[in-house]
Amino acid sequence: MLSSNECQQIIALVKRQVVPAMGCTEPICVALATSRATEELGCRPERIEAYLSANILKNAMGVGIPGTGMVGLPIAIALGALIGRSEYGLEVLKNCTPEAVEEGKAFIKEERIGIHLNEATQEKLYVEVVCHSADGHSAKVRIEREHTRFTYVEKDGEERFRSDLGAGEETKNEGGDLQLTLKKVYDFATTMPLAEIEFINEARKLNEAAAQRSLDGNYGHNLGKALSRPLGRGILGESIFSHILSSTGLACDARMAGAMIPVMSNSGSGNQGICATNPVVVFAKENHNTAEEMTRALMLSHLTAIYIKQNLGALSALCGCVVAATGSSCGITYLMGGSYEQVTFAVKNMIANLTGMICDGAKPSCALKLTTGVSTAVLSAMLAMQGNCVSSVEGIIDEDVDQSIRNLVSIGADSMNETDKRVLDIMVNKC
């Protein structure tokens, strides 16, 4: 039984981790740091230096920046300085205009931006931006561990702000003394008074709209549209399954291509927010579940993803869709009428299937991985509802579902570190 204090901690946790985002969150995170540094400087910077962790670089190299028609960090940094407002968080660039983009292009052409790999940091999410003015002043800002967590601010060498979480031993599982388990996640989502969790429906509104707006343009590899066209429908048919894939693909296509379309993120990732939301919404609507069931399924999906990501970390070598799709599989299992035991079956099936999918940066082809993840989510839920799950004698699956999750985390957070280095090396050295 969850205590009242635990329930309030969980609500605060979800509200902190499920927030709107405009554009891929890694370059946006750098833009956010730049905007804050510019605000501290008090004028337009003459020169900007960014020192970034490998995972930030990896995820920012090939992804579109909203409203620019451009990819990568330079334009994100330039716009962060020119029109960014740190109070907007992950929507820092929502005031972008064509005029600002042209000004940003000139800023880049004048070689005012330096981007560097910080090889010394142990943090996978690390951003340090230093802005210099023409008259010799400077401002430095750091973001660490979470995409909106400012850990250090200084002006002209004088410390303005420091967070203890920016130094020392990493604390992956935050939320005070809150220790989540899958059972706690399930109990919270299925028993909390509906009025206290209805805020999660904002994710449905934003991410459904993102998929719908994607139909109005040509984005990325047009995966969502391909699934909706005669060839896709001829192969997959008109089914809940095909609609789940197309809705997820559409939203991701637009986001990765840099469309000015906000989405609700999960644990600092818009794609994870899409993956945790759209499959659940499509299934609930077409399965004729009640509004309450949809709300509870969305909370189960998002909170499961948060629980796993708390231990895995915001960035890792493991593709985030593995985590978020595990959440959506739980939500779909619940919508099918599944019990807690069947939800655990779905989680084990997901871990057995998708563990090891690498993250090779944020980019348009992420839509392919998301649809792979959510198709597996449906398959895992179907098997779970029939009482079938991967057993503890098979591979990395343990009889205890939380230990199975810890096994996934161990592989993604620790064992794949060398893989992560090799992936980045390949990406930066391609001809």
Which functions belong to the PLM regions below?
Residues 38, 283-290, 294-296, 306-372, ...:
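Hydrophobic alpha-helical bundle architecture
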Residues 1-11, 43-56, 239-258, 290-308, ...:
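Acidic-glycine-rich active-site phosphate/pyrophosphate-binding loop
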Residues 109-258, 425-431:
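Signature of multi-pass transmembrane helix bundles
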Residues 2, 22-25, 55-56, 145-147, ...:
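A structural signal for small-residue-enriched, beta-sheet-centric alpha/beta enzyme cores
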Residues 31-131:
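Early transmembrane hairpin of solute transport permeases
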Residues 20-36, 261-278, 319-323:
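Conserved phosphate/anionic-ligand binding catalytic regions in large, soluble enzymes, centered on
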Residues 44-48, 88-93, 114-116, 194-201, ...:
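Flexible, glycine/charged-enriched surface loops at secondary-structure junctions
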Residues 2, 6-41:
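N-terminal signal-anchor module of multipass membrane proteins
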